[in-house]
Amino acid sequence: MFELTDAQRQLQQSARRLALEAIAPHAAQTDRSEQYPWHTVEALREQRLMGMTLPPEYGGKGASYFDTVLVIEELSKVCAASGRIMVESNMGAIGAIMKYGSDAQKQLAARLVLAGDKPAICITEPQAGSAASDMQTRAERRGDTWHLSGCKHWITGGGVSKLHFVFARAIEDGKDTGIAGFIVVGPDVPGMTIQRIPAMGIRGVPEARIEFDDMRVRHDMKVTPPGRTEAGFAGLMNAYNAQRVGAATVALGIAQGAFDLALDYAKRREQFGRPIAEFQGLQWMLADMSIQLEAARLMVWKAAASGSEFPSMFAAAQAKIAAGEAAIKVTNDALQIHGAVGYGRDLPLERMVRDARMFTISGGTAQILRTQVAGTLLGQKLSQRRSA
């Protein structure tokens, strides 16, 4: 279905070399220290991979999402945190701003990303996870200034990101006009407080709780697509489909990295006088892992190539479900093949198991995404709200 061009193969190989030479040697320490991998940022920036999807007129390469996922997978095989940085410097918040923002907003966002910033998209709230439109964060307009108040939760990059794309209810003249996006350049902004949330995996990129207490944002930092504000929210969320494809690719990369380790180990490890790869039970495990990986990769590639501007919601949801669930299964099976040595910290497998777990949760749970897929198949929006 997909045949990579020579240029794409070269890009893939270049990303693989970068991952092995500049990122893999630091991956374990990044996890143990729970420190942001600035060495990765510098390596990506030097190779012009941060912001590679930006249009050339804004300093990027104008790379397609398809080309971008090729890079993301290679990085994620050795370090999920690095793959996550690659995703969010090319997809999600930056995509929404480049599509719907003013020229000044685009220039600002591009400048920050090209300098090495990983934008933070601020949607989730303590009481508004899957039900994102239930968000309570408010932005009240007073003249040419918006005053933001509320709380965002599980914000990836909180504390290290400069560019924050904050979703909030826009209040004008006392009326709720719908959800809009606001560009906030932080993290040291009056009225903005950030608290890190300790997490199970991908510890090199912080998760955070961000509170806004009458934080002021200039009116020219509001991003709303043309048309009604509610339709504008839907437009902004369309950009999030790309982020889901990126997340699916990180999950795929983690799983592929674990599989590669398991396959090599099975060939070398001997028990009962022969390599364990000769045991049928283990052969079937490897076969199933390979099948899950190839199926997930095809869905990720299809999603990355779908849509005219952003990946389609349907394809992105399918890819994220498939890759997220494959990552959990494949990493656990890879650890099982290694036995006790996989359970130890000398190998990256226990880290991969922890890192993989988030991908059926964040950015849309596997359950809520299945509802979206079903709604598309049935041609209707399947509301999860309790009937009156």
UniProtKB/Swiss-Prot annotation:
The residues the record assigns to binding FAD are 121-124, 130, 153-156, 269, 336, 363-367, 384
* SUPFAM superfamilies given in the database record: Acyl-CoA dehydrogenase C-terminal domain-like, Acyl-CoA dehydrogenase NM domain-like
The EC category is: hydrolase
Give me the reactions it catalyses.
Answer: 3-sulfinopropanoyl-CoA + H2O = propanoyl-CoA + sulfite + H(+)
Q: Where does substrate bind?
A: 240-241
Q: What is its EC number?
A: 3.13.1.4
Q: Where is this site: Important for activity?
A: 84
Q: Which segment of the chain is annotated as a signal peptide?
A: none
Citing just one GO molecular function, the answer is: flavin adenine dinucleotide binding
Cofactor binding comment, as recorded: Binds 1 FAD per subunit.
| Alphabetically ordered keywords of this record | FAD, Flavoprotein, Hydrolase
Q: Supply the Pfam families for this chain.
A: Acyl-CoA_dh_1, Acyl-CoA_dh_M, Acyl-CoA_dh_N
Positions of transmembrane segments: none
Q: Which cofactor does it need?
A: FAD
> Does the keyword field hold Glycoprotein?
no
Q: What does this protein do?
A: Catalyzes the conversion 3-sulfinopropanoyl-CoA (3SP-CoA) to propanoyl-CoA by abstraction of sulfite. Does not show dehydrogenase activity.
The record's NCBIfam families line, in alphabetical order, gives:
SulpropCoADesulf
Q: Which family does it belong to?
A: Belongs to the acyl-CoA dehydrogenase family.
Quaternary structure and partners: Homotrimer or homotetramer.
Protein name stated in the entry = 3-sulfinopropanoyl-CoA desulfinase
> Which species is this record about?
Paraburkholderia xenovorans (strain LB400)
